[in-house]
Structures are given as structure tokens and as C-alpha cells.
Amino acid sequence: MMQKFRIQGGGPLSGEVSISGAKNAALPILFASLLAEKPVEIANVPKLRDIDTTMELLGRLGVNITRNGSVFIDASGVNEFCAPYDLVKTMRASIWALGPLVARFGQGQVSLPGGCAIGARPVDLHIHGLEQLGATITLEEGYVKASVDGRLKGAHIVMDKVSVGATVTIMSAATLAEGTTVIENAAREPEIVDTADFLNAIGAKVTGAGTDTITIEGVERLGGGYHEVVADRIETGTFLVAAAVSGGKILCRNTRPALLEAVLAKLEEAGAAIETGDDWISIDMTDRELKAVNIRTAPHPGFPTDMQAQFSLLNLVAKGTGIITETIFENRFMHIPELIRMGARAEIEGNTVICGDTDGGLSGAQVMATDLRASASLVIAGSIAEGETIVDRIYHIDRGYEYIEGKFSALGMNIERISE
């Protein structure tokens, strides 16, 4: 049963929306809970397919896991150390089980992963990091196997390239290593900071998260604790762009403006009126002209690659020409041909996309979601296009946006989920 969204083009999107917890923080935190010998409560976990898959995976490993508002985890009974292919194939994040398993139990194996089709994301950086902490890694029959006699050993690790995933793996595993670990050229994303906050809540000694040098003083064991997942900055940005391109006015609650500085600066440059408080952001585009902006994606605190597709849509319907340069992932313009089907004028040249004035606006069409963030831009495009748009393969959206049609409906979008 393939589900699709049917969207009728309409007016401005306006109102209030409550932002969910960040998938990209919730996932590493759920996997890191394998390190805890006592019960853990994690609040503000979004309801998403990848989260469900992770909970099922942890359950298979022997974790007692329940959801009742928060997610409650008891990893004291872990008795299985292999993350099997049938679960891993749908989700790359499963590699995050490896570090905690080998750090706490001296062994772990994870099937080589699946997930979105964006470029080459090798697990080499994860493997290399664990090897530097003293683990022995082998690749056998499609599985990455890690083992260590006794405890992992602290190490000074200089990352070959900035990687959020590998930073999480090394940081998590190092919490139970003997001695001190220093990670240089570490990723600085807010989700890394949130994972470190969780680790510290259960007794780890992590400092420097959010900078390019993270220090982890190993401890013998980790207990239990409580943590609330940080707000999703990408979901926030997606709703802000929806207001900008539709000429609307939206207030995002339960969010963190400080994590979105690069995005907010570009929205202001594009002509939006932005206001912020401690945990809210408002955008007003009523009677204002949208102007195209140039963007170059970069690791945090630069402009996030996960907002690139939404801003290509903004540029396509704005006045003037905007150039977007993608420096993080290859093959990340798969939404552009779909937008061209709706009448957009854009040219892809290598890792840049040049978005020109789309005279006469967009027209509804049948389009296909190709990856998580790109698919959100197609939904927004449908709401500002003339006529009806069908977005196919929306399982990509369900992997990363909680109840997106409900939230958009409340803002005035004419959207429904249909099964065919």
C-alpha cells in the first residue's frame, strides 16, 4: 500500500506550530542508552519511523523499552550483541549500536546499513575511530564485527574529516574507555551537544561538545538518568520557509533560535521579518517581497545541508537569481527535476544549482519524494502551486517529520494522505 499526499494549491500558511524533538539527536541518544546499566527516561522523542525501528532494534538486543509520553529504557538485560540486516537495511543510524556494545560488553556486530540514497556515506570513519580506541574490527558476510579484550583504551583521535556520525560513535564508546580520549576536528552540530548532555546525565565525563575538540574522561560504568531531547532545528526551518514562500505568518514554539542562526540570517536576507524569544521564532512575510539568496552549505555553525532543498524552493519562487552550492553530500539535488516538472526554472552545474525567476509561478504535478528533506520542499511547493499536486513515496517524509500533514493542515494547507 503506497501512501501519497494530495495537496491543493492555496493561500498563505499562517498560525502556530509546536516543534518536535530532533530525530538527529533522539537516534544517537537512544543508541547511547545501551551504555546505561540503570533505567533511563528520554523525553521529547519524536514519533517517527526511524525511532520505531531503533526501539525495535534495541528490543531485539534485550533492552526493555516502553513508550508512555517519554521513552523508558532499561538496558540492564542486554543479551544479544548483533543488529540484524532486516532492521538495519532501512536505516543507516544502526551503526551507532556498535560503539556502545563493544564499549560495555566487549563485543558487537552490525549489518552494513541502508537509509536515504544520498551519496557515499561510508562507515569507515566509525570503524577507524573504534580501532583507535583499541577495538578489533572485521567485516564478515555483510556485518561489521567489533571486539575488545577488557576495556577500550582512551586515545588522541584526529578525525580525517568532520563527521557527525563518527563523532557520536567515538564519543559514546570513549565514555567507558580506560583513560582520557580527545577527539580533534570533531563535528560541532547541536545534536552532538545534546548527545553529550545525555551521556553526562547518566554519569559520563564529556567536555567540549559543540567545539571542534571534545574530551572524554572514561568512567567504569554508567548509571541511569533523565534527558529531554533538543528541538528539531531542521523541522523549525522547514516551517519558516513554508511561511516565507507562501507569504504567511507562522510562530514556531518549543524551538531553539540559537541553533538556527545561519538559517534565520538567510531568511532575513530574503526579506522576511523574524522575531525570536528563548524558545520561539516568528516569521512574517505578509505583503513583503521574497528575494533570492546565495547559499553555501557547511558544517555547523554554517548553513545546514538539511535546509538546502527548502531554500532551493524559496529561490525558485523569489525575485532574482540565487545560487546554492552543496559542499556536504553529493547527489543532493534530486528534488530539482521534480520542481522543474512543476514549472520551476533551475539548472544544476556540478555541486551548484542556479535558481532563476519562475515566471507565472508553479503548477501542480505528480512528483516523487527522493529523500527526507527534499520531500518536505515538494509538499510546500504543492501548497503554493496552481492546482493539485500528488507527492509519491512519502515514506521518506515519515522517516523524519512527525505528523507533517496534521501540522501543515493546522496552518491552512489543503493536504491529505491517500493510499493507493
UniProtKB/Swiss-Prot annotation:
InterPro entries: Enolpyruvate_Tfrase_dom (IPR001986), Enolpyruvate_Tfrase_sf (IPR036968), MurA_subfamily (IPR050068), RNA3'P_cycl/enolpyr_Trfase_a/b (IPR013792), UDP_GlcNAc_COvinyl_MurA (IPR005750)
Entry's family note: Belongs to the EPSP synthase family. MurA subfamily.
Pathway: Cell wall biogenesis; peptidoglycan biosynthesis
Subcellular location, principal: cytoplasm
Natural source organism: Photobacterium profundum (strain SS9)
Any GO molecular function: UDP-N-acetylglucosamine 1-carboxyvinyltransferase activity
GO biological process: cell division; cell wall organization; peptidoglycan biosynthetic process; regulation of cell shape; UDP-N-acetylgalactosamine biosynthetic process
One protein family per Pfam: EPSP_synthase
Matches recorded under NCBIfam families: murA, PRK09369.1
Listed name of the protein: UDP-N-acetylglucosamine 1-carboxyvinyltransferase
Tagged with keyword S-adenosyl-L-methionine: no
Positions of post-translational 2-(S-cysteinyl)pyruvic acid O-phosphothioketal modification: 116
Gene3D superfamilies xref list: Enolpyruvate transferase domain
Catalytic activity: phosphoenolpyruvate + UDP-N-acetyl-alpha-D-glucosamine = UDP-N-acetyl-3-O-(1-carboxyvinyl)-alpha-D-glucosamine + phosphate
Annotated keywords: Cell cycle, Cell division, Cell shape, Cell wall biogenesis/degradation, Cytoplasm, Peptidoglycan synthesis, Pyruvate, Transferase
Domain of life: Bacteria
GO cellular component term, pick one: cytoplasm
Compartments, as annotated in UniProt: Cytoplasm
Positions annotated as active site in the UniProt record: 116
The EC number(s) this enzyme carries: 2.5.1.7
